């Protein structure tokens, strides 16, 4: 039985089949086409298939659906393998390639031809659409080639394989039901001609099986019991079952569908994502603004937060739109516990402590992670000198109402160090403040003033002599429209790109303990958010997520 913590309509179906003895082993699969990078929507399919197999002590396969050679390639195969490894979704049932079944798919196609259940058609794509009618009431009519004899069809199909015909000149269609209200059952194409080299098979083949034909065959060969896929394939289920019944004569594999994961301000279409990459609108498939798993990984997302988000978004049969802020909130909750604290000044201005010795340097112990565990008292040493960097936004000559940080004559605490009072500023020829002067109360090291006076604000700082220079990239949503699935059909999705999806800050100042930080490390930059070193560009930090948001889990 399914774990109560992972119970949904899919586990109800599986529980019933197990109880009736219809299956002994729960065997699932994740079948990505290697023509693009996996995204957050793919993570839902991985999570469902992997977790269901794991909960029932079953098997989980990874199968590359490489039956359409036009855009497929090894680059995508390797990225998919990396993504599953990152997610710790181990395919304990094995790793397979749909192209390894080409010979068997071909043999099954010949079987259907011999049984009078498939025929070679000469109609063009446009003519076929006309003949098939539509689901709005236009009836279909049979192709003039529908009644070819099995012998003639077999000869033509073998000549298709031999390369005698051009792309689109002929197709192999299943002979099912032209009167069906389901368009997928009106003699669907199951083989087409494509004189395109395959990334694994080379030029061995010039005919390729359609997904709806190859997929159920592959499932049956691998012993899949539950073929779990997204809701767009619901109308394809009768064809899936037709293939299984006519070629294998059994009930299983069983296809069932779940709703896709849609996230606000995001597109999931590979076509759209590819266009963003190919037109250099983004910095590759792993741009931190992209919804791809490689982009989320580069952004700093954790694999555990991805699966937690997918689980909390729910598994149902009804499409819904999940707020991106829920995805961020899940990650933020994890990072709040696990990310080490560090100090970084993103938009620096110099603070000079006039009464502090120029040749002196002392070290303050700052906590690494005060929120992780009450017993976690680990600290690191941070250098303090006469000249410091503070945030430009932490000082105002003429402060706005309720401003609690540094102004002329006011006093603040330098986090973990001294109280300082602003005494003046230096300006350039344009009147811009280039340095702030202050005096420290040197009796307040790590403590409160003896006279008990209250200080309203605390600001962070980095020593000018002991810091690292960095570029910081602050990310926002990639699209301005919340529901990108609702834009008009004739609209250009690129018109909805957010012009402010990234803000680049040059010259940020980081505490020197970050010199050994590497991609994959995650830090809370105190008061500024969560950040990680970029995996492509040295000296660049990506903001993973902000410190706070109004969204509540």
What role is predicted for each listed range?
Residues 31-35, 63-71, 94-103, 126-127, ...:
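Conserved short loop/turn motifs at secondary-structure junctions
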Residues 309-319, 324-553:
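Substrate/cofactor-recognition hotspot
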Residues 6-15, 19-81, 197-230:
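N-terminal catalytic cores of NTP/NDP-binding nucleotidyl/phosphoryl-transfer enzymes
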Residues 23, 118, 166, 183, ...:
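Intrinsically disordered or highly flexible coil/loop and linker segments, enriched in small
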Residues 66-68, 74, 111-273, 331, ...:
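Active-site cores that bind ATP or allylic diphosphates and position pyrophosphate for catalysis
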Residues 76-103, 108-109, 116-119:
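A glycine-rich helix N-cap at a beta->alpha junction
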Residues 253-330, 334:
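Long, charged, mostly alpha-helical binding arms that flank functional sites
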Residues 19-22, 51-59, 85-92, 220, ...:
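Secondary-structure transition/capping motifs at alpha-helix termini
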């Amino acid at each position: 039985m399914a774990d109560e913590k992972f119970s949904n309509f899919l586990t109800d179906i599986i529980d019933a089949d197990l109880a009736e003895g219809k299956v002994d082993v729960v065997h699932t699969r994740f079948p990505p086409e290697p023509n693009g990078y996996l995204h957050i929507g793919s993570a839902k399919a991985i999570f469902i298939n992997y977790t269901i197999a794991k909960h029932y002590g079953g098997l989980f396969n990874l199968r590359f659906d490489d039956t359409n050679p036009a855009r497929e390639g090894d680059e995508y195969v390797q990225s998919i393998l990396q993504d599953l490894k990152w997610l710790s979704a181990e395919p304990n049932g094995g790793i397979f390639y749909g192209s390894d079944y080409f010979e068997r798919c071909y043999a099954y196609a010949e079987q259907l031809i011999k049984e009078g259940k498939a025929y070679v058609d000469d109609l063009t794509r446009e003519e076929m659409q006309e003949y098939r009618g539509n689901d709005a009431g236009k009836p279909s009519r049979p192709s003039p080639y529908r009644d070819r004899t099995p012998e003639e069809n077999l000869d033509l199909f073998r000549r298709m394989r031999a390369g005698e015909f051009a792309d689109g000149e002929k197709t192999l269609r299943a002979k099912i039901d032209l009167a069906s209200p389901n368009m997928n059952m009106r003699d669907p194409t199951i083989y087409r001609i494509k004189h395109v080299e395959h990334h694994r098979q080379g030029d061995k083949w010039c005919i390729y099986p359609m997904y709806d034909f190859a997929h159920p065959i592959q499932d049956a060969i691998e012993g899949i019991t539950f073929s779990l896929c997204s809701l767009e394939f619901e109308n394809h289920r009768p064809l899936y079952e037709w293939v299984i019944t006519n070629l294998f004569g059994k009930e299983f594999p069983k296809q069932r569908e779940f709703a896709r994961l849609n996230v606000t301000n995001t597109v999931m279409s590979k076509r759209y994502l590819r266009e963003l990459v190919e037109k250099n609108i983004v910095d590759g498939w792993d741009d931190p603004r992209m919804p791809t798993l490689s982009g989320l990984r580069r952004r700093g997302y954790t694999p555990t937060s991805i699966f937690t988000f997918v689980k909390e978004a729910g598994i149902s049969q009804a499409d819904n739109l999940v707020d991106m802020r829920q995805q961020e909130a899940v990650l933020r909750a994890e990072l709040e516990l696990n990310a080490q604290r560090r100090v970084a000044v993103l938009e620096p201005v110099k603070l000079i402590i006039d009464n502090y010795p120029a040749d002196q340097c002392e070290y303050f112990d700052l906590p690494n992670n005060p929120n992780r565990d009450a017993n976690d008292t680990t600290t690191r040493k941070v250098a303090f000198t006469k000249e410091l960097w503070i945030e430009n936004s932490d000082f105002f000559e003429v402060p706005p109402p309720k401003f609690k940080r540094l102004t002329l004559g006011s006093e603040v605490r330098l986090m973990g160090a001294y109280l300082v009072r602003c005494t003046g500023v230096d300006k350039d020829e344009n009147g811009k403040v280039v340095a702030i002067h202050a005096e420290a109360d040197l009796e307040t090291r790590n403590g409160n003033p003896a006279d008990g006076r209250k200080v309203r604000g605390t600001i962070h700082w980095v020593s000018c002599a002991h810091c690292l220079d960095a570029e910081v990239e602050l990310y926002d949503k990639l699209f301005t429209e919340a529901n990108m699935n609702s834009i008009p059909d004739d609209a250009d999705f690129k018109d909805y790109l957010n012009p402010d999806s990234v803000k680049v800050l040059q010259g940020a100042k980081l505490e020197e303990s970050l010199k050994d930080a590497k991609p994959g490390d995650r830090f809370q930059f105190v008061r500024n958010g969560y950040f990680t070193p970029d995996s492509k560009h040295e000296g660049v930090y990506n903001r993973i997520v902000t410190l706070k948001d109004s969204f509540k889990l």
